[in-house]
């Protein structure tokens, strides 16, 4: 029986699709009169590529064609070009690129993830995506692809241990709310998804990271301030981060900052600050400077906590924690001379 060809005359094979896409992206890059036709060809090629990777309603993706397309994307450098030229592609095309990128990233052969291996050896792809936060028309698309990359520990590690990681502290403060929120979602993902990796990263880079982090906790932007406080609470209460927590709660300047945030004008900020403050007070191994601050403010703190957010009548855990902290502060004694 004669074997049917994988691609009919009307359907281009992966190598042809990749070549047409590359050629037309090159035309778009020149920004000359031929761009309309090129833009149309780019859209068609992206659709064809998506069809191979995702299949159609009645057909599963053809394994052989998917493998060919993946190989072409790597060998031609098109995966890099698609990110580099994302701003030149129309709205629907940007969505297609995101879908193609995330689909090819999830592809596995046994236990191997070929695209993860490819990006690991071409890490500038990650930094191009990260820099996308600086371009409003592609920022959210880059965020989606970046978070898909972060699901894979080797790629998360490259970003965490890079100089570019610190750019997040700038991006989460951007004036465009959608972009700043998306950047924070990616930032949070990086710091919470791979627990052992993150603990190692924070231990190695404690001073630098927490110096930057403190600025977020004092941000003029309410959302940034609240999200950062909430994330800090999650980080120091995670058992993997015990060393980081111990270091953080040993420093008097951190306790002073939380005591100030307990008096913030926003009840939500106060509440998030409470969840960090309680770790200082509840710790059985307080450093002497911490004990001294708590003793110096002992009567004020007891009075303050007694009436702190009394309106939270339905939150039993909060009431129990508050009573526990009041008892801990009341029982503090000056060290014997």
From Swiss-Prot:
It comes from the Eukaryota. Coiled coil: none annotated. Pfam families: Mo25. Component of a complex that binds and activates STK11/LKB1. In the complex, required to stabilize the interaction between CAB39/MO25 (CAB39/MO25alpha or CAB39L/MO25beta) and STK11/LKB1. Component of a trimeric complex composed of STK11/LKB1, STRAD (STRADA or STRADB) and CAB39/MO25 (CAB39/MO25alpha or CAB39L/MO25beta): the complex tethers STK11/LKB1 in the cytoplasm and stimulates its catalytic activity. Belongs to the Mo25 family. This is Calcium-binding protein 39-like.
